[in-house]
A protein has these predicted regions:
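Mature, function-bearing regions of proteins
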Residues: 1-190
Length: 190
């Protein structure tokens, strides 16, 4: 509950020293590569050197099998994700405090669903996690947005860290992962 996304939070601390300029530099590194930056930027170099290399436990064949399963589900998978995984998850107020405080559930619910759906489509394409493919860039960009929200909420008087922990913390991310995986599997059995 007390840990966010340390590597991306370091990037966000750097971005917020000059938000307009540094966000553009981050996006250049994400979508075009570090070699397209005007100079080496240690915060970005450290982060991208980390995420551009798969962890030792990663098994590409298992990921490919999972992606093929999602393709076999067709539109049923999308409905289960929207109507069961997301809607069930949105019912937990503690877990969703970042969405509630930022207005993402009230004012921007449709946009939030569309963004999540786009991310899902991006990560369920074959080879999507290769460096410049959509699954990779979408996932890193989601991490960026989460770090931005975390940065802002940590400055907000509305955020009760003693009750909710770090905004968009590792525990909440694990619960999201369970909703997107386990609930999907339960839904297809129904």
């Amino acid at each position: 509950l007390q840990t966010g996304d340390i590597p991306m939070d370091k990037v966000m601390a750097w971005v917020m020293t000059n938000p307009r300029q540094n966000r553009k530099l981050f996006e250049t590194a994400l979508y075009q590569g570090l070699d397209q930056l005007p100079e080496q930027i240690p915060a970005l170099t450290e982060f991208f050197n980390l995420v551009e290399h798969a962890p030792s436990w990663f098994d590409a064949s298992k990921l490919e099998t999972a992606i093929q399963l999602t393709h076999r589900l067709g539109s049923n998978g999308t409905y289960i994700m929207r109507d069961l995984s997301l809607m069930t998850g949105y019912q937990y107020p503690g877990f969703n405090q970042p969405l509630i405080i930022t207005g993402a559930l009230k004012k921007y619910a449709g946009k939030r669903l569309a963004e999540t759906h786009k991310w899902w489509l991006d990560v369920t394409q074959l080879n999507s996690f290769e460096r410049f493919n959509s699954g990779f860039t979408s996932t890193v960009y989601v991490r960026f947005i989460h770090a931005l929200v975390r940065f802002q909420l940590n400055k907000s008087s509305e955020w009760d860290r003693d009750v909710w922990g770090e905004p968009i913390n590792q525990y909440d991310q694990a619960m999201t992962n369970l909703a997107f995986c386990s609930v999907l599997l339960l839904g297809v059995r129904a």
